[in-house]
């Protein structure tokens, strides 16, 4: 990686603004439902604290302003509390990993937990060194930052409560920059957005470096894209071909050895071949594109593998009509919702002997049981291939959820925190949040 990282600079005693990605699902009870992104940022947070920095954490959560506008237009209630990072703050305070973190050479241990709670269990009650700001800019926040001591952490409130964040507004970026001496981007999941906290802020903070998670993401994805160990197999799923065209074309151009396509996007390919797809999701405007993709794959010597069977339901009786049939025998009243057992076996065999695997996107309607079976089967196949020597990279919400649901997270080489960012990077696009960082 040709970007400077937090390890390349001296941060002791400095105010370090770390852009993290804490855009995590929060349940109605206020508990974090998936802490993957939070845990991904912990090495950088811990490193900064141990080096004696005054740590400022900033993140977005959802799209509060857009959702507020929609609620007002529909005359619906708007709950501002669901967009607060307060729940993340409570979660951070109780993390065992952030206990007993001491600054280098200090006499007193710096501790980041003080009360029990959250889904991770109980944390020992100790001195509280993690704080929460009720805002992300302004005089009150400035005062809180000035009170920070070395090794202490301040989590700012949701950046997207201000329109200037998504607009990459210079004034908002300047206000964020005034809080710090050093900028660290550790939010790979937001690196494809040119927002005030991912790009604009670097106009005002000249020291702008990558965090440890950002470094890890870029190293894994760069190797997969530019110098993969072969055979190289990519698995793509999800609803729409249109969302994946750039990454498909990039993978074919780089001559991925095998390209496995599942999920609803497969039906656009089936219809382009003349198959009847019933009421399955199809992008009719993408039919010619699907044909062109198949031609390009063939010309490049890329083995493009589509499902051979799928789980379907009758659109008129979805609760009682599930069955598995060959894809070419789909009549007009059926809806395809997952890959079948035969396809799962074919995909598993396609991964045998692979040395590099990239997977993004579910194989079916993962959020509805039993149509998560195909995605879980692929997760198991990827984990098995990893145990047999493959480097595996999994990105995208449903793909990562499948890995976690199956208890396979420890068996995957790298679980990417990026969804759209991962896809754009694999498409060969330079991400704004990465481009803004200092070169080595």
Question: Predicted regions span which residues?
Answer:
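Active-site loop-to-helix "anion-binding N-cap" substructures in soluble metabolic enzymes
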Residues: 1-440
């Amino acid at each position: 990686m040709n970007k400077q990282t937090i390890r390349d600079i001296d941060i002791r005693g400095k105010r370090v603004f770390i852009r993290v990605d804490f855009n995590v699902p929060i349940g109605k009870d206020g508990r974090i439902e998936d802490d993957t992104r939070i845990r991904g940022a912990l090495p950088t947070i811990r490193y900064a604290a141990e080096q004696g920095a005054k740590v400022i954490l900033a993140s977005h959560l959802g799209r509060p302003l857009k959702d507020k506008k929609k609620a007002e237009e529909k005359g619906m209630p708007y709950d501002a509390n669901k967009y607060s990072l307060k729940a993340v703050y409570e979660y951070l305070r109780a993390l065992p990993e952030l206990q007993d973190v001491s600054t280098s050479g200090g006499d007193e241990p710096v501790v980041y937990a003080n009360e029990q709670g959250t889904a991770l269990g109980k944390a020992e009650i100790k001195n509280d060194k993690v704080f929460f700001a009720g805002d992300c800019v302004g005089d009150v926040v400035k005062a809180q930052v000035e009170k920070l001591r070395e090794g202490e952490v301040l989590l700012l409130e949701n950046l997207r409560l201000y329109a200037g964040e998504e607009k990459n507004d210079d004034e908002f970026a300047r206000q964020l920059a005034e809080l710090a001496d050093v900028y660290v981007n550790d939010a790979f999941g937001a690196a494809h957005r040119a927002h005030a906290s991912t790009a604009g802020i670097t106009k005002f903070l000249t020291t702008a470096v990558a965090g440890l998670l950002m470094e890890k993401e870029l190293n894994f994805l760069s190797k997969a894209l530019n110098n993969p160990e072969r055979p190289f197999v990519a698995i793509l799923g999800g609803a729409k071909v249109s969302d994946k065209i750039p990454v498909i074309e990039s993978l074919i151009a780089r001559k991925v050895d095998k390209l496995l396509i599942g999920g609803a996007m497969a039906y656009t390919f089936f219809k382009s071949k003349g198959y009847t797809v019933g009421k399955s999701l199809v992008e009719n405007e993408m039919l010619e594109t699907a044909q062109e993709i198949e031609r390009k794959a063939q010309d490049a010597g890329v083995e493009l593998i589509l499902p051979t069977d799928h789980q379907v339901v009758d659109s008129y009786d979805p609760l009682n009509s599930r069955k598995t049939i060959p894809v070419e025998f789909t009549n007009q009243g059926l809806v395809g919702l997952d890959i079948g057992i035969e396809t799962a076996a074919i995909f598993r065999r396609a991964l045998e002997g692979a040395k590099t695997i990239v997977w993004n996107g579910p194989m079916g309607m993962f959020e509805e049981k039993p149509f998560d079976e195909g995605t879980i089967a692929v997760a198991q196949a990827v984990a098995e291939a990893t145990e047999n020597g493959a480097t595996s990279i999994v990105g995208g919400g449903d793909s990562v959820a499948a890995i976690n649901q199956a208890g396979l997270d420890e068996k995957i080489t790298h679980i990417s925190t990026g969804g759209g960012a991962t896809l754009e990077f694999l498409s060969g696009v330079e991400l704004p949040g990465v481009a803004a960082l200092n070169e080595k």
